[in-house]
Amino acid sequence: MQHGIKRVKLSEEAKRLKLEKDQIKIKNYRQLTDEIFELRANENYSDEALIKTNELLIINPEFYTIWNYRREILINNYSSSNDKDDQIYEDILNQDLNFVLVQLKKFPKCYWIWNHRRWLLFELVKLGKVNWKYEFGVVSKLLDLDQRNFHGWHYRRFVVKNMELECKNDTTLILKINLDEFNYTTLKIQKDFSNFSAWHNRTKLIPKIYNLIQQQQQQQQKDGKIFGDLPGIELFQNPILLLKNDLEMIKTGVYMSPEDTSVWLYLYWLLTDDLFTNAFKSHQQDYMNILHEQLQLINEVNEMEKEDTGQDNVGCLKSMIFINALIQNENNKPVLTEQVKSCLKQLAKIDPLRKNKYLDQLAGNAPIFHH
């Protein structure tokens, strides 16, 4: 039994039939591969060659050499740089986008499919026929199917960047695009606190949005209202307000999934990024209060975990060490306090894979904290 699915034990006859069937598939695959390699060696860029690459890439989308050959076919047989009509090339590129989309739905984590789609779009850019808004809709739907897909999030940032380039002289529109992305990360995180890519995207968006607002305010000598009522903009009037908002948001994640590193990594970023720490320069005690509040919260979660599981939570202990180290640094005192030592000793017991690291930290032979 694996993931709730009962394994079916094949009879000897069924095994033999399966083996015969697999051998036929392997033979056909090798034959098709040899045919395509021969076509490429002969610099054959025909429609028939393109169809052959279709057949092989449907079977094996990881075969990046075939994607390379496919691009050679498109350029040599259809590209307007080879005296072909722009409309013909545009049509074939859009057909290929459709082919790629079908493959992405079946293999959403295959890098080479995403890579080929980017290439197709840049070819359309050369023709002045790319539709980034449509592409934005495509990647949004793909992320709805798999909201934690790293490739999908990376591709979404790529699309957003190109949408920004199209409106580079309209900073208000650029701001709206990024605020919409910020709100999108909020929705995705609320659905799944383990969505590392959404948290990561948030760390990129927050400084960017804040800087956009600051630039506009400096240029026009006005407050944030110059942007109208853009959803979410009110949070960015003050970094401390934004920090408190996000600390409140991740509190749920800490309580629900203390074993999930995504939430902890985002917490570390919130507590150490210059955007937030610089805002506390004239209010140092407020920063210390926040650190102590977070330490108390994590200690409470750890106590609840001990009641439920009978032992400390690794994520909680590591975070308690991290925040204690921040507090000691702010006070210009040694990091290796008795509480930190106690946490390290517990970690050495419950996290044996990293036991030697914790022991080195206890002995002062490895740093406790990097900042």
From Swiss-Prot:
GO cellular component: Rab-protein geranylgeranyltransferase complex
Entry-linked InterPro entries: Prenyl_trans_a
Family statement drawn from the similarity comment of this UniProt entry: Belongs to the protein prenyltransferase subunit alpha family.
Name of the protein in question: Geranylgeranyl transferase type-2 subunit alpha
EC numbers on record: 2.5.1.60
Keyword Transferase assigned: yes
GO terms under biological process: protein geranylgeranylation
UniProt xrefs under PANTHER family: GERANYLGERANYL TRANSFERASE TYPE-2 SUBUNIT ALPHA, PROTEIN FARNESYLTRANSFERASE ALPHA SUBUNIT/RAB GERANYLGERANYL TRANSFERASE ALPHA SUBUNIT
Lineage: Eukaryota, Fungi, Dikarya, Ascomycota, Saccharomycotina
Source organism of this protein record: Candida albicans (Yeast)
